[in-house]
Amino acid sequence: MSERKIAIAMSGGVDSSVAAGLLANRGQDVFGVMMRLWNPGQDNYNRCCSPADMSNAKTVAASLDIPFYVLDMQDEFKTHVVDSFVYGYAHGVTPNPCIQCNRIIRWDLLLKKVLAMGASHLATGHYARVTHNNDVYHLLRARDRLKDQSYVLSVLGQEELSKAIFPLGEMTKDQVRSHAREMELSVADRADSQDLCFVGNLDYRTFLEEFAPELPPPGPIMDVQGRQLGQHEGLANFTIGQRKGIGLTSEKPLYVISKDFETNVLTIGERHELGRDTFIVQNPNWIQGTPPSSDESVLVRVRYKSQEGEAFVVDSNHEHATIRLVEMLPDITPGQSAVFYTDDECLGGGIIAT
């Protein structure tokens, strides 16, 4: 029996369930925890952590013969994730709530809670890897590049990584499901969850109408030359690079080039007018404590599933970092995270400001 005690964050899905099973089957001292993030009366849209999710996680824990606890974190989630999501859209940016959830909810507040419960480590069902050498922890991409989630874990530092365990980091999704069937887990064939877990079956725009009725009003649609082409229904309905749903007819495809919260202007243009080669991230987090040198070429991803580009971090301090791309990227979007890599290693990231 291992001397360490591991809390496994469970969601009722196949990934966290298999992660729990792998740890339990290795003889680890494991207990399951699940965060209650929404009031059970608010599950009419199949939002995350519904009563059904709770029941699934509890059933899996019982089948693995591990203790299971539910932690009420509704207030924290509402304040730090949902309200932040709404605030971002209300102020003209496109936030990534998964980044915020991992930074504050899972790897700060939850980690502190399980440590207080006697755990030495926190495990999750994320697809990522951690290595340790010369007293330094490294966050690596998952072996399965298609499932890799190091992007949303770029907010972690040395302290968090020293206590993080990712049992699925070397596995493919097919292997995970195969393990779930071998373990006879009730969730073996459950569908994957969506990115915006708390939105559920709602379109995010409908969610915003429910939780943020005072979003920016309709305003002008302009081209890059400053000519007005029409009227938009509110900046929250658009994101950089968007093509569909702009509301204009044109012989050539049109894309969202920028959103100006101060003037409430939506600027659109053709694809060749989209993209930048320089941008700024705010409050960058460097996993090893220091940024790459200004002459070191790195890879940057500016959205979770976007293509990566070669870049240089030419200036960085605690408040911001300036990023210069070798070639322009088309989808640099304020509010999203820019995450940096060298080969398989995630160096860290920051929120795109401008």
Regions found by a protein language model. Give the residues of each.
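AMP-forming adenylation/ATP pyrophosphatase catalytic core
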Residues: A123-T131, D135-T354
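ATP-dependent adenylation/nucleotidyltransferase module used to activate substrates
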Residues: M1-S154, D174-Q175
